[in-house]
Amino acid sequence: MHRYRSHTCGELRASDVGSDVRLSGWLHNRRDLGGILFIDLRDHYGITQLVARPGTPAYEALDKVSKESTVRVDGKVVSRGTENVNPDLPTGEIEVEVSEVELLGAAAPLPFTINAEDGVNEERRLEYRFLDLRRERMHRNILLRTAVISAIRHKMTALGFNEMATPILSATSPEGARDFVVPSRLHPGKFYALPQAPQQFKQLLMISGFDRYFQIAPCFRDEDARADRSPGEFYQLDVEMSFVEQEDVFQPIEKLMTELFEEFGGGRHVTSPFPRIPFREAMLKYGSDKPDLRAQLELVDITDIFEGSEFKAFAGKHVRALPVPDVSGQTRKFFDGLGDYAVEQGAKGLAWVRVGEDGSLTGPIAKFLTEENVAELTKRLSLAPGHAVFFGAGEFDEVSKIMGAVRVEAAKRSGNFEENVFRFCWIVDFPMYEKDEDTGKIDFSHNPFSMPQGGLEALETQDPLDILGWQYDIVCNGVELSSGAIRNHEPEIMLKAFEIAGYDRDTVEEQFAGMLRAFRFGAPPHGGIAPGVDRIVMLLADEPNIRETIAFPLNGNAQDLMMGAPTELDETRLRELHLSVRKPQPK
């Protein structure tokens, strides 16, 4: 028999009754019932119940073993009997009567209970992550991540993509987030940077003659944490394709996402094809360029209805309406609750009216609406008895953000929100440029390296604020999974695009010398995308925080509490790297 086990803890069934077996695992739980000791033994594969009778060496040994210790046990498989079957366990028809016990690794007193899923401080969990990962939910999440990455590789290869590795040590990048830098011992005073993304390298692969590239790429950004973003390190499915237009990128990614989310989504349906929504339309209808399409309500721009209005709350402002059908059964609490929610999002309040059986409008602002206002609102919003309308007014970006959040919350509270579904969309036609309202300066609004729609002619003849870029986002249930673009591969178009944003030619030539040099040697049209693996797994696992899907994440302050990183270097190491440390003075 094997030194540690003949079977796993998830393997034994009724057909194994009478067999002599050896198991190894962690002592998950213990119960003493009428002097008989019942032990749940857990390993990677499952749980098997052990039984130790009083007066036996096995009982004496197991009675002294602390929870989460590792043990090896020998014993005989016996039936639990029909009345004692545990239907929640695959091994629930049997138990193992233990005859011999070997303690493999004793566990110290636990900092928290392993088999209690909630109520444990996250900082403590991260400090003892090796214990936290023993919990069923966390173990399941990490295995899901493994399976998803394996499936991505298989599916991308089947779609004709080739997996290639790009450098981890590279040059610092002048755009994007802050770099993590690595000092060079051999080149005093010089530094490498960990890649924020393999962006330039994957484009260089296309220029090198490769056609369809992908990589499960580690990316490093010195930025703050969010619920959907891990500080420090994250992984993305990095993709680039040659001789493509926008739809050519969409097709394989849409197929991949549909198959991936159907396979691992736990029965939640994927709606396809994914709609293409222009950026401006998304902001007007949903108040966000990351719309949650499970919310079956849409905003309506009614600014024109109130142009020149004497109602000061709306006059001269951007006004958005949110019609909500069939709220006849809702009390004042529903309306006040949404008003409170809007205030939490930054609004001063939330105006509303409701439609009576006779079609008349009642509510806090009804008296300020003229007959013409009411007639136009009824027509524009297709109002009917039992409907309600919520209003937001202000600057475009402000009212979009607030009413976008209210749209989703109102859908949830009014029964207009789809559950158990993944609703994807593509956001397209992003503006190439935006104007800083304070300085009047024109700058890039999103990706400076995307190809402008209309090419050089558009840059030379159109108002910069009217130019759109070949840029796109893929969004699922209100979570942005990735941005992407058709790249600007022509040096003269790139230089002109940067000139409009206020960059002189020499600066661009210096900062992007490597890419511009490559572009001048026959670069193909190319484009790509890079969906975040961590965010994909977060959605599939239905977790609210991305750290729940990463084996060893940093905390919100970019610290590894388990390993004690970041650490200080001693003087010897600093001298080797030609560094000295200058800490900020306390304020």
UniProtKB/Swiss-Prot annotation:
Gene Ontology process terms (BP): aspartyl-tRNA aminoacylation
Q: Which domain of life is it from?
A: Bacteria
Question: Could you give a GO molecular-function term held by this entry?
Answer: nucleic acid binding
* Gene Ontology CC, one term: cytoplasm
Q: What class of enzyme is it?
A: ligase
Q: Where does L-aspartate bind?
A: 175, 221, 446, 487
The reply to whether Nucleotidyltransferase figures as a keyword in the UniProt entry is no
Reported EC number(s) for this entry are 6.1.1.12
According to the record, the residues making up region (Aspartate) are: 199-202
The entry's ATP-binding residues are: 221-223, 480, 532-535
Pfam families membership: GAD, tRNA-synt_2, tRNA_anti-codon
UniProt keyword ATP-binding present? yes
Q: How does it assemble?
A: Homodimer.
HAMAP family on file: Asp_tRNA_synth_type1
What PANTHER family does UniProt report for this protein, alphabetically? ASPARTATE--TRNA LIGASE, MITOCHONDRIAL (PTHR22594:SF5), ASPARTYL/LYSYL-TRNA SYNTHETASE (PTHR22594)
The molecule here is called: Aspartate--tRNA ligase
Which organism is this protein's natural source?
Answer: Streptomyces avermitilis (strain ATCC 31267 / DSM 46492 / JCM 5070 / NBRC 14893 / NCIMB 12804 / NRRL 8165 / MA-4680)
